[in-house]
Design a protein with these regions (language model features):
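Acidic catalytic motifs of isoprenoid enzymes
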Residues: 1-149
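Short, solvent-exposed helix-loop connector elements
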Residues: 146-159
Length: 171
């Protein structure tokens, strides 16, 4: 699988290194993404590329290879869905580590001070969830389509995909 994995690892590492450089260039104590576009870009490099990789690996099965082009329409969104949910779920831990994946456009909209992220009002918490959940739900819908395209007789692969999907959906 090296011929599948290696170029995608390079793509992912290259994208993540750009984000690391953006943080290094920032003078802020907490590095924050500017907008939803930057968040989607980040999610692509850390998770969307994994969706591409898994599809290429899964497609080594003759049963799945027949659906490959249709799966490829949804594979990036699979990763984005899971990562968006992680961003929503883990934002306080991320901020403690000096990263804020909740875009500046969202924190400004709800007058959120990153230094007091642990003391958000219910309205501020709901605002974060609402603004990030809209794209996340779209990505989750696409993920469900991806799973439905997997042949029924590929039960292990289907379960491999269903379990994180259900966990993300239930979060």
């Amino acid at each position: 699988y090296r011929e599948i994995i290696d170029p995608l690892i390079v793509e992912s590492v290259t994208g993540m290194s750009k984000l690391q450089q953006m943080k290094a260039d920032s003078r802020d104590k907490i590095f924050q993404l500017k907008d939803i576009g930057e968040l989607e870009n980040y999610c692509y490099y850390v998770a969307g590329v994994v969706g591409k990789m898994l599809t290429a690996i899964f497609s080594q099965s003759k049963n799945i290879s027949r659906a490959r082009s249709r799966l490829e329409r949804h594979n990036v969104q699979f990763g984005l869905a899971l990562q968006f949910v992680n961003v929503i779920k883990d934002y306080t831990k991320d901020i403690e580590r000096g990263w804020c994946y909740i875009p500046l456009t969202v924190t400004k909209k709800y007058d959120i001070d990153l230094d007091s992220i642990a003391n958000l009002t219910p309205g501020q918490r709901e605002g974060i969830v609402k603004d990030l959940l809209v794209p996340a739900v779209s990505y989750l819908d696409s993920t469900l389509e991806y799973i439905k395209l997997l042949p029924l007789d590929e039960m292990n692969i289907r379960m491999f995909c269903i379990i994180p999907f259900v966990l993300a959906y239930m979060t």
